UniProtKB/Swiss-Prot annotation:
The modification Phosphoserine is found at S145, S164. Keywords: Acetylation, Activator, DNA-binding, Immunity, Inflammatory response, Innate immunity, Isopeptide bond, Metal-binding, Methylation, Nucleus, Phosphoprotein, Receptor, Repressor, Transcription, Transcription regulation, Ubl conjugation, Zinc, Zinc-finger. One of its GO terms (biological process) is cell differentiation. The gene is NR1H4. This is Bile acid receptor. Acetylated by EP300. Lys-223 as is the major acetylation site for EP300; the dynamicly regulated acetylation inhibits heterodimerization with RXRA and transactivation activity. Deacetylated by SIRT1. Methylation may increase transactivation of target genes. The modification Phosphothreonine is found at T452. Residues 134-209 bind DNA. It is found in: Nucleus.
Amino acid sequence: MVMQFQELENPVQISPCHSHTSSGFDMEVMSMKPAKGVLTEQVAGPLGQNLEVEPYSQYNNVQFPQVQPQISSSSYYSNVGFYPQQPEEWYSPGIYELRRMPAETLYQGETEVVEIPITKKARLGASAGRIKGDELCVVCGDRASGYHYNALTCEGCKGFFRRSITKNAVYKCKNGGNCVMDMYMRRKCQECRLRKCKEMGMLAECLLTEIQCKSKRLRKNVKQHADQAIHEDSEGRDLRQVTSTTKSCREKTELTPDQQNLLHYIMDSYSKQRMPQEITNKFLKEEFSAEENFIILTEMATSHVQVLVEFTKKLPGFQTLDHEDQIALLKGSAVEAMFLRSAEIFSKKLPAGHTDLLEERIRKSGISDEYITPMFSFYKSVAELKMTQEEYALLTAIVILSPDRQYIKDREAVEKLQEPLLDVLQKLCKIHQPENPQHFACLLGRLTELRTFNHHHADMLMSWRVNDHKFTPLLCEIWDVQ
């Protein structure tokens, strides 16, 4: 939940056709057969006859730390009755497991020191020197290479988790989900391995989206170009020639007629969808109890969702998408679009001196500082970019039309709608800020921060659920609150 406060004379009501519960969705997750594991390391001696019982029998003279058996937990969702029943492998950008177990080491005792000096051969693919000491992977017990997706893991578990999430893989355990994960069993049971990854704190939202990867490449390219320009300047380039070249590039960078029409259409829809100013004024002018503050914030969020639905319906090409894809895009982007709109209001719409007052009132609404601090940090980082309303509108549309949302059936169709928006945004950045070639990459980089807020929002929902806070039917629908 986040704070929405913007001027709108007439908030719009959501169309009945968009009241669609998550239980009505056709969850189409590709079923993938587990690949047969192959031992990557060559061993000196023959393996034992029974690999299931003695997987390390070739190492008779070496002592290994004992693995603490991990008890498979039942579905967390079914225990709290918070979200609909889904497989544990299922992830959605707006819905995450709400419990993250601490990355505790699975090993009891200390490894015995061998007096004979032994030179260890580095694992292939491991990043030597990234961590101190012989830290162990919290998933399988192999040598860890660093913190990957929020957990200390080896390169193998890092790659396995990334592939499993990006491909929406669904695995099946032959032992009823009771496998004890170690370096041998990780090759035999992918379901238990993926579950162990999640139990140890690995987060799906830490994976970069296609847009975020593009942002990283842009930052790298910009740095290379900047270094090259400095080198050329040091060799005697005339400063006036550089200024002339910059001016020439700015003149050549302009929107095509089709891009101008697209931008006008987006801006017309974005500017019409505003939230009632009286809610914000009420929140700032009067001081309420924590419960009353929560009710006001709920009203703001409801108004935001109504505005978001209307804006989304008017995005060019959105109505041509499959109906289930439309709902998946709307639900998947609701939290991110909400935070982005709030950042615009925080940086541009609030009167001078009201930002600190707003933060103070929100902290008194019962929301933990654990969520409020990164939220306002994000608002301030966005304000530093000095974004125009055109950039806010385009970035919001890009967030909504993200082809990597869960349960999108026709990702190519969504990507075709998103690409023209990215092109227009990139050109606008060159036109408005030619002296700052990194501006476009910085805008896309904010999408990385937005993805992390999905998890914060899920945690907030859980804490409010425990405290028996009530939500409007619209928020229950869009956030899948039962």
